[in-house]
Amino acid sequence: MAKGKRDKIRMVSSAATGHFYTTDKNKKNTPGKMEMMKYDPVVRKHVMYKEGKIK
């Protein structure tokens, strides 16, 4: 079976709450690390989420 073009990634909160979102990204179009502002329900604010590996 062929390997897919998208990798599953984990978006980890920079607020150090341990909260994360899972998503996927296209390896070819976005080779660098993703960063985006998302809502962290633990601190009840929008914070920066950075890409991490799924274990």
From Swiss-Prot:
A Pfam cross-reference name: Ribosomal_L33
A molecular-function term among this protein's GO annotations: structural constituent of ribosome
Keyword entries, A-Z: Ribonucleoprotein, Ribosomal protein
Coiled-coil region: none
GO cellular component: cytosolic large ribosomal subunit
UniProt-listed GO biological process terms: translation
Similarity field: Belongs to the bacterial ribosomal protein bL33 family.
Identification of the protein by name: Large ribosomal subunit protein bL33
Organism: Xanthomonas oryzae pv. oryzae (strain PXO99A)
